[in-house]
Structures are given as C-alpha cells and as structure tokens.
Amino acid sequence: MTLSRPSLVALTSLLLACSDRFTPPAGTLTGTFGGPNMELNFGSRIVQASRICSGAIFKGPVVPDANGDFVLPSTSMLGDFYSSIQLEIRGRLVGSQIMASVVMTGPAGTSTEQRTLTRGIKGDFSGYACAMSQP
C-alpha cells in the first residue's frame, strides 16, 4: 500500500495529535490501592474504581491537597444493573493508605461505606461469582 503525500501528512498529524505529551501535575496520585471488595487504580488521566460486580471511571489526574484529601466526584457506575447508581469517593491519603468514604446514591437513597485501601494491594473480590478483573 502506498500513501499519497496528503494522506501521509494527515496520518502523521493525527498520530502527533494523539501522542499528546501530557505531563501530569506535581503530586499526582498514581498506582493501585486495594482492600476488601474495592480497588482504585490512579493514572495520570483517569481513575478506575472497581467494586463487586461493577465500577466507575473518573477523570484524572488526582492531586491530593496539603492534608492528603481528594474527591472523585459523583459519576454513574458501569453495568446495566448499576447504571442508575452514582458513585462518589472522598479520600484521604495517609502514608501508603487511602481512608475512603464511598458514597453510592440511587433510587433507594444514599449509602456511605468506609474503606481502607493500601498502595500496591489489589482489591480482594474473592467469594464473588462476578469478581472484577483489570481491563
């Protein structure tokens, strides 16, 4: 296959645009934090939250404030059954752990759970038939 010069220029421009050299801000939270029934994967552009049988994607980067506090604002959970449920996570980074308030709001109301997630630990979804896996 031979590309004409205009096609080659267009393809090169597209590739350069897609290879955005994004540099996350200083202090950006990265890595995996996990615990019982939950896992957070912080990247420079997105945060993936995995819960039993569902999860959510939040926009990144996440930069905790001077106290280590951050908020992952309310977003719809993934999956047909969970799509009417909103997930919000309010966290505090303390050393290698995140102390998180996990807020779920749906047709039945709002519930809040407290979770402690540890850096470098994957979420433990054992015992559940619909255990989440990394994409």
Language-model region placement:
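Short, cysteine-centered beta-strand-loop-beta hairpins and adjacent loop/turn segments enriched
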Residues: S54, M77-S83, P107-S111
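Tryptophan-anchored aromatic micro-motifs
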Residues: R21-E39, I98-V102, D124-P135
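Bacterial N-terminal signal peptides that target proteins for export
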Residues: M1-L8
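C-terminal motif of bacterial Sec signal peptides marking the signal peptidase cleavage site
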Residues: L15-A17
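N-terminal glycine/threonine-rich, aromatic-flanked beta-hairpin/loop signature
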Residues: G35-L78
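An anionic, turn-rich surface loop/hairpin at beta-sheet edges
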Residues: V71-L93
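Short, surface-exposed coil-to-beta transition loops
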Residues: G35, A56-K59, S83-E88, T112
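Surface-exposed, polar helix/loop patches in the mature regions of secreted/periplasmic/lumenal proteins
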Residues: Q86-A131
